[in-house]
């Protein structure tokens, strides 16, 4: 079977495993080459038949011919993806389905640990008629059924252990390693490690003891059944807990954690704390019945027939003699007088079990009330470390109290501590933010910053917290593989970049390159993004918010231009001109505008070096369509275009007005000459020729002086208008660079 991989941009084929004829001599010069993706086995000379069998054929021949051992280390070692082609179902330990089953098995182990203490509730003290100790048959049937169901799940898990591959220890040099899929090796490994523990844990010993009692003579089997259940459950707890620890650790290695959420993790550890309380309460109930039985036995020692008195302490004992029956009727009164836990002058000290005897829990037939009371007793004493327990001098009782105190300490140190860690993880970011704010306030107070600067710092911290919740998104993304990082950036930024008109019609490769290099930026109100004359080190693409863009054309007096930037606009276009210029040096261009945030602004920033790289790698930026789009949406080009149009309009208006004035002047001159001719005809002939010529010359001089004065005024006004509109054209990006 061949597997293809891409190495250094080329497609290579590698052989996973080959079946080599066992008849070939070792001296045939077999050469084995190990690659980083598999094994490549080649034979030289003396071959009797070819060793080009596929991996699937090798799996079929496993029963008869065996396997080739490579270096006596890894037998039938493959990679996880090769498990899918095997005919026999072998599970990958990190398979999702197997992880779900492992979680179910962990839950079944928890249920098994919680079901076993229910056997302690089977003994019951009957004080209704004759005082005796019996077995609750209904609860016995229910408990054995639950235990059998849990054991079925446990047996299923044991069966899966024979079909779950494991990682070969010799292949853990680099990466995850190779999986051993040989069923014989898997079975050998499981049988030598955990099979004995699993077998002891799943033995149906409690079911056998209860079944024997239910189908036996009952009366004579109460004491052996009670003793057997106590010993069996305690003994089987050891392998169950021993097997549960590696199961949870294995689940953490493959899945990371049993509960991923904070509340789920807290509930998981709280469940274990409640389970410990349940076990403690069940032990307390069983030991209470034992102490009651001990008191009755002490009372029977003073009777004429102690042996017969002990026999009647267990319900179901049959007697034939009428004399014995009459004597038995007096025994309950005797037991109550000697073993009453309510009397102040009781002859027997029950110690910590007196509460169970006096409350009637041991004689109650209602399981739910009995279970809740014992659960509360266990939870109360584990939480208080057994401080309220008043023990007697009985050694078993004292040891049980010591065990409660130690268990309480361990639970607080482990379970409650882990639960607190999970709950604190919900507010750890908030606590970090509070610490940073406190440090910031102390620093500002130490440096005596003015109130307006302090308010700006507080506003920025608050805005950044609301937007990111204390998560450093950039570090999270940068820690991922390149391919995954590119896909995440594409998902987050592609639609936003396409909303920028400059990149609306770009191809996918260019958009991916831009998205991969964008960095999120946040700005609060009244923050200056860039000032006029400062170097432009990044190009900003506005995602949300409004900004003000102002220019004075280098501080020219009387010149002021203001524009608004909104969602979809960009600033720092001087950087694009610099990036598209192949002859541009390392000096960054100066900003021609001052950009100030009017509201809270979210934007993506493209740094100078990143933009230079994108412009040099993608020729799509060097197109006329991009040139027109850049000019249309550039604030610098808009300002120049508006000034250019205004200047052209003024020139046109000036020429139009000059033409109108020339027409008016001609009309005035013609009208003046006509009026002068009419007045000359009406005058008397006495006027001499000399007087007429002198007046005409004066009129001509006056009209010329007025025309020259108007012309000078127009020239001065035109020169002043030229100085107002003389705005330098923005530099043209080199879109034709190749």
Curated annotation (Swiss-Prot):
Region (Disordered) location: 671-693, 715-738
Gene3D superfamilies, per database record: 1.10.287.70, Helix hairpin bin (1.10.287.630), Jelly Rolls (2.60.120.10)
Topology Cytoplasmic: residue spans: 1-104, 161-193, 249-268, 417-738
GO CC annotations on file: plasma membrane; pollen tube
Pfam families membership: cNMP_binding, Ion_trans
Residue stretches spanning the membrane: 105-125, 140-160, 194-214, 228-248, 269-289, 396-416
Topological domains annotated Extracellular: 126-139, 215-227, 290-395
Example GO molecular function: cGMP binding
Main localisation: membrane
Function: Putative cyclic nucleotide-gated ion channel.
Family statement drawn from the similarity comment of this UniProt entry: Belongs to the cyclic nucleotide-gated cation channel (TC 1.A.1.5) family.
Domain remark text: The binding of calmodulin to the C-terminus might interfere with cyclic nucleotide binding and thus channel activation.
Name of the molecule in the record: Putative cyclic nucleotide-gated ion channel 7
Source organism (scientific name): Arabidopsis thaliana
């Amino acid at each position: 079977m061949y597997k293809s991989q891409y190495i250094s941009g080329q497609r290579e084929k590698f052989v996973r495993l080959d079946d080599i004829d066992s008849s070939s001599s070792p001296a045939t010069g077999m050469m084995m080459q190990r690659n980083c993706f598999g094994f490549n086995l080649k034979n030289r000379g003396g071959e009797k038949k070819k060793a080009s069998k596929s991996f699937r054929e090798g799996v079929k021949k496993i029963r008869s011919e065996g396997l080739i051992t490579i270096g006596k280390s890894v037998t039938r070692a493959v990679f996880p993806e090769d498990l899918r082609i095997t005919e026999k179902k072998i599970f990958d330990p990190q398979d999702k389905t197997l992880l779900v089953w492992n979680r179910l098995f962990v839950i079944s182990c928890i249920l098994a640990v919680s079901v076993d203490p229910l056997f302690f509730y089977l003994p019951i003290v009957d004080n209704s008629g004759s005082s005796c100790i019996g077995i609750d048959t209904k609860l016995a049937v229910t408990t054995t059924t639950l235990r059998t169901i849990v054991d079925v799940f446990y047996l299923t898990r044991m069966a899966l252990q024979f079909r779950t591959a494991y990682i070969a220890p010799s292949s853990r040099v680099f990466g995850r390693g190779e999986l051993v899929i040989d069923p014989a090796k898997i079975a050998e490994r499981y049988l030598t490690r955990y099979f004995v523990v699993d077998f002891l844990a799943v033995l149906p010993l409690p079911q056998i003891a209860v079944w024997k009692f239910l189908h036996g003579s009952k009366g004579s089997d109460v004491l052996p059944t009670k003793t057997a259940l106590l010993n069996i459950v305690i003994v089987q707890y050891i392998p169950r807990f021993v097997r549960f620890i590696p199961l949870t650790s294995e689940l953490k290695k493959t899945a990371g954690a049993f509960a991923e959420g904070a509340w789920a993790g807290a509930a998981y550890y709280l469940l274990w704390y409640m389970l410990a309380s349940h076990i403690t309460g069940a032990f307390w109930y069983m030991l209470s019945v034992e102490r009651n039985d001990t008191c009755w036995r002490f009372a029977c020692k003073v009777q004429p027939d102690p042996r017969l008195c002990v026999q009647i302490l267990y319900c179901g004992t049959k007697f034939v003699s009428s004399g014995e029956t009459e004597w038995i009727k007096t025994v309950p009164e005797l037991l109550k007088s000697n073993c009453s836990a309510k009397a102040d002058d009781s002859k027997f000290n029950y110690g910590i079990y007196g509460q169970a005897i006096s409350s009637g829990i041991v004689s109650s037939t209602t399981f739910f009330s009995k279970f809740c009371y014992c659960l509360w007793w266990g939870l109360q004493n584990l939480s208080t470390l057994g401080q309220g327990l008043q023990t007697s001098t009985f050694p078993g009782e004292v040891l049980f109290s010591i065990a409660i105190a130690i268990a309480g300490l361990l639970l607080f140190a482990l379970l409650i501590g882990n639960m607190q860690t999970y709950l604190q993880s919900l507010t750890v970011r908030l606590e970090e933010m509070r610490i940073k704010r406190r440090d910031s306030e102390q620093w500002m107070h130490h440096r005596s910053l003015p109130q307006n600067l302090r308010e700006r710092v507080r506003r920025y911290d608050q805005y950044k917290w609301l937007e990111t919740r204390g998560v450093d998104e950039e570090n999270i993304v940068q820690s991922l593989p390149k391919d995954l990082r590119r896909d995440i950036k594409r998902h987050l930024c592609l639609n936003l970049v396409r909303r920028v008109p400059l990149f609306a019609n770009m191809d996918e490769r260019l958009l991916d390159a831009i998205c991969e290099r964008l960095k999120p930026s946040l700005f609060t109100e009244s923050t200056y993004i860039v000032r006029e004359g400062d170097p432009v080190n990044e190009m900003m693409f506005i995602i949300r918010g409004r900004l003000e863009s102002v220019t004075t054309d280098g501080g020219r007096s009387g010149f002021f231009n203001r524009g608004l930037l909104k969602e979809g606009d960009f600033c720092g276009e001087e950087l694009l001109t610099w990036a598209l210029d192949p002859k541009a040096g390392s000096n960054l261009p100066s900003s021609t505008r001052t950009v100030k945030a009017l509201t809270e602004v979210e934007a993506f920033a493209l740094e100078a070096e990143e933009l230079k790289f994108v412009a040099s790698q993608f020729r799509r930026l060097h197109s006329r369509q991009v040139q027109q789009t850049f000019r249309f949406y550039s604030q610098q080009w808009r300002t120049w275009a508006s000034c250019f149009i205004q200047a052209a309009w003024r020139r046109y208006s000036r020429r139009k007005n000059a033409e109108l004035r020339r027409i008016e002047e001609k009309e005035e001159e013609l009208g003046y000459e006509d009026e002068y001719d009419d007045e000359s005809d009406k005058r008397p002939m006495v006027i001499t020729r000399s007087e007429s010529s002198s007046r005409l010359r004066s009129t001509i001089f006056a009209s010329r002086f007025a025309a020259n004065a108007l012309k000078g005024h127009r020239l001065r006004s035109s020169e002043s208008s030229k100085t107002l509109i003389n705005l330098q054209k923005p530099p043209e990006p080199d879109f034709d660079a190749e």
